[in-house]
Design a protein with these regions (language model features):
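Non-heme Fe(II)/2-oxoglutarate
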Residues: 2-79, 86-88, 93-96, 121
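A structural signal for short, well-ordered beta-strand segments
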Residues: 85-87, 108-110, 188-192
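Histidine-centered active-site/metal-ligand motif
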Residues: 86, 99-101, 174
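Catalytic core of non-heme Fe(II) oxygenases with the double-stranded beta-helix
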Residues: 90-165, 184, 197-202
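Histidine-centered metal-chelating micro-motifs
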Residues: 94-95, 171-175
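Short beta-strand segments enriched in hydrophobic/aromatic residues
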Residues: 112, 172, 192-194
Length: 202
């Protein structure tokens, strides 16, 4: 049964003192990697030798899978891991459609070359945005402080910065906006698998 709307207590939700608890957050790790410029030359060299793989890319060039460069090994936050990587070179009006990285634990990207005025952000989608569509919208309408404090959005986009690296759960759906620049946007993406550990719960 649909209850009638009670307009007599409109201020109650605003005045009630609640603690917002970010339960089951999606963790995105961010760091910077110096001396990455040599990887740009490697990406261009491979493009002259390899045809593009077709995966999530809409246009652009996607290299073959290969070992993760030793340069990045010390930035992996795990003592044991296995992984592969690939280069992406996107030009004007090229990007990546929404996807995940199945059969992996973590995924990541290191931005190598980022043209100005590109617009090619990396967007992450809320893992349960469709089921929680109204919950997210209503909380953000009445309590925008929760949205800002806990990134309680339907989607969140990171602007790429050369030398910056993100790592995120491989199941977290994401996409890359079309590049609006005429210069190349180059990145190194990777997948990480980890050994099975004892389950930890509260």
């Amino acid at each position: 049964m649909i209850m009638p709307k009670d307009t007599s207590n409109n201020t109650r939700s605003q005045d009630t003192n609640y603690n917002a608890i970010p339960l089951f957050p999606s963790i995105v790790l961010q760091t910077t990697v110096p001396n990455f410029e040599e990887l740009i030359d490697l990406a261009y060299a491979q493009r002259t030798e390899q045809e593009s793989v077709i995966a999530s890319n809409m246009g652009g060039w996607h290299s073959q899978l290969q070992p993760i460069p030793e340069l990045l090994h010390k930035y992996m936050p795990f003592p044991e891991w296995e992984g592969t990587c690939w280069y992406m070179i996107n030009g004007n009006m090229q990007g990546n459609y929404s996807h995940t990285h199945p059969q992996n634990d973590w995924a990541g990207v290191l931005w190598l070359k980022v043209p100005e005025e590109h617009g090619a952000k990396l967007e992450f989608e809320h893992p349960d945005c469709f089921a929680q569509y109204n919950a997210i919208n209503s909380m953000n309408h009445y309590h925008p402080d929760v949205q800002d404090k806990f990134n309680y959005w339907q989607a969140y986009a990171f602007p790429p910065i050369a030398g910056h690296m993100l790592m995120f759960p491989a199941s977290l759906r994401h996409r890359v906006y079309f590049s609006e620049a005429t210069e190349d946007r180059i990145s190194l993406s990777f997948n990480i698998t980890l050994p099975t550990l004892e389950f930890n719960q509260r």
